[in-house]
Amino acid sequence: TLSRQTLDADLRYYQRIATTGVLALRFRGFKSYGAYPDFLYFGGNSEMRGYDYLSFVGQNSVFANAELRFPLIEAALTPVGVMGGVRGVFFANLGGGWFKDQGYSFATSKAETVTPITGYQTDAAGNLLQDSSGNPVAIYGSPQTITGFRLKDGRASYGFGLETFALGFPIHFDWSWRTLFNTAWEDQVFASSGGSATFRKPRFAVWIGYDF
């Protein structure tokens, strides 16, 4: 008997735009099941820009990327020699990962009332208080009814970047913004860390690696 079965699909499409631009699309779907299922870690870099590296994990995972790539400078003469051209990119990402029986909901438009966690109780020394199970004791805010489309457990981001070759390595400079497509929902989900305003703050990242 097999201890695990895994399906992993990676679909890509490239469309030339004018003479030097490229529209690049990718979809990856991963599912593993059995007594000892595999897990897929992803996030950051070219997979889910704006989120921490490998911050998504699950035996079920999906993510999609769309990128518009276009040249800005064909080549550059620098004090250390000729560098590769500089390319611009606009990107958007959508995805999520989850485990079996987790109760995962990628997105919804249904109205629901939620009670946000606004923080956690601490003692006089500033240490987190724990309940009998060892979990932090939460502080709850007032219930709020949320309406409209939003990502529940799914995540998305968008932004722009610059790419170049330096000393033989592809280097990326990205500016990205995270979103769940609903600021009222983000205010509840991230109430303990500053709400939507903090979640949507631009994030800058530098990474080395090839595009998909």
Regions found by a protein language model. Give the residues of each.
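C-terminal transmembrane beta-barrel domains of outer membrane proteins
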Residues: 1-212
